[in-house]
Amino acid sequence: MSAFGFPGGGAPTPPQGSFWDMTPEQQGMYSANLIMGTMQSCPGKSVMAGVTGFGLGGVFGLFMASMAYDAPVGMGVQTMSDLPFKQQMKIQFTDMGKRAWSSAKNFGFIGGVFSGTECCIESLRAKNDIWNGVAAGCLTGGGLAVKAGPQAALVGCAGFAAFSAAIDVYMRSDNKAPPSTDEDL
C-alpha cells in the first residue's frame, strides 16, 4: 500500500488482452482483486464507513423518533392529543423523517471522517495498533467541536479518543493465542 492507502500500481492489469478475452475464472479473480484493492484503500474505507454510518444512523434516528412521546420539534403544537388522529400521524411521520435524515447525515459524516483519518494515520505510521484509532478519534472529535471553541474541541478530542481506545481494546482482546488445554479456560 502506498501513500494514504491508494494501491501502488493502480488497478491490477489483466493477464492477457482485454477483460472479455479472459476465462470466467480469470475474470472472477481480476474482479475480486479490483474490489479488494478498492476496499483496502483509504478512500474505499471512508466511503464504506460513511455509507454504513448513514444507513445505521437513519435506522437509529427512526427508532429514536418513534420512542419520543413529546411534541415534534418546530411544529408549533402544544399537545398532540388535542389534534385529530390523521394530523397526529402526519406530524409524527414528518418528524420521524427529519430525525432519521439528521441522524443519518451525522453518523455518515462521523464514520467517513473517522475511518479516513484512521486509515491515513495508519498509512503514514505504517503500523496497525491502538494509537491509530486514538489519534483519529482525537482529530475527529476535536474537528467536529472546533466551532464551539477550544475548550469544546479539547473535550471532543478527549472523548472521541477515549471511546476509540475503549473500542480498540475490546476488539483486540480476542487476538490472543487459543488455550492449550480445556483446563486453561
UniProtKB/Swiss-Prot annotation:
A GO term, aspect molecular function: mitochondrion targeting sequence binding
Keywords attached to this entry: Disulfide bond, Membrane, Mitochondrion, Mitochondrion inner membrane, Protein transport, Translocation, Transmembrane, Transmembrane helix, Transport
Any one biological process term the GO annotation gives: protein insertion into mitochondrial inner membrane
Subcellular location: Mitochondrion inner membrane
Membrane-protein topology: Multi-pass membrane protein
GO cellular component term, pick one: TIM22 mitochondrial import inner membrane insertion complex
Disulfide bonds: C42-C119, C138-C157
Transmembrane segments: 47-67, 130-150, 151-171
Subunit description: Component of the TIM22 complex, whose core is composed of TIM22 and TIM54, associated with the 70 kDa heterohexamer composed of TIM9 and TIM10 (or TIM8 and TIM13).
Family: Belongs to the Tim17/Tim22/Tim23 family.
Function noted in UniProt: Essential core component of the TIM22 complex, a complex that mediates the import and insertion of multi-pass transmembrane proteins into the mitochondrial inner membrane. In the TIM22 complex, it constitutes the voltage-activated and signal-gated channel. Forms a twin-pore translocase that uses the membrane potential as external driving force in 2 voltage-dependent steps.
Protein name: Mitochondrial import inner membrane translocase subunit TIM22
Taxonomic classification: Eukaryota, Fungi, Dikarya, Ascomycota, Saccharomycotina
